Amino acid sequence: MRKVVLASASPRRKELLSKLIGNNFEVCVSSYEETPLQEMNVEELVVFHSLEKAKDVALRFDSGIIISADTVVFCDGAILGKPHTLNNAKEMLENISGKSVLAITGMTILDMDSGKCVSEYVSTDVNMKQMSSDEIASYVNSGEPLDKAGAFAIQGKGAVLVESINGDFFNVVGLPLFRLGTILEEMGISIFDDC
């Protein structure tokens, strides 16, 4: 199998990629610093960040496939990244309570051997339940929201805050597996080799 490198420190992305290709990849964290760019819309921004992460990690390798991603939650015209404090998480959850939000992941797959690069985004509609202040406080105090875009983890306790989704569940977690699997197959990485 060709070398595959995940350009992410996210344990969730590592777990998701292993669902597709087993542990046949290495992790190399990008040193690219994400900064908001006012001239870009949210979709352009997450694609730009994922591309810059992939390019940064590619400098450390001679060959292989680099996979990078950037996920945000978008609500009422605002980008919600990862909350840095408990109070920030509380404010985010109060803001998204009872609303439909978008989980948007920019993803780049860079084949260093062929020069092919796919950079695109995947969106998933997420309908949040109306949360009471006690629910928000309890969830925030669990600590789970702190390193999650939009302050909720659909794959964890935050699942009870989500009424429904329309789109790729794994995109909300941080890596759109359906689209990623399709692109990897196109680049010669067989998802079903070990089946």
Curated annotation (Swiss-Prot):
Enzyme class name: hydrolase
Cofactor(s), by name: a divalent metal cation
Gene Ontology CC entries for this record: cytoplasm
Record has Membrane as a keyword: no
Keyword Cytoplasm (UniProt): yes
InterPro entries: ITPase-like_fam (IPR029001), Maf-like (IPR003697)
GO terms, biological process: nucleotide metabolic process
Its EC number(s): 3.6.1.9
Compartments, record wording: Cytoplasm
Active-site feature positions: D70
NCBIfam families given in the database record: maf, PRK14365.1
Similarity-based family: Belongs to the Maf family. YhdE subfamily.
Function: Nucleoside triphosphate pyrophosphatase that hydrolyzes dTTP and UTP. May have a dual role in cell division arrest and in preventing the incorporation of modified nucleotides into cellular nucleic acids.
The protein's name: dTTP/UTP pyrophosphatase
Native organism: Methanococcoides burtonii (strain DSM 6242 / NBRC 107633 / OCM 468 / ACE-M)
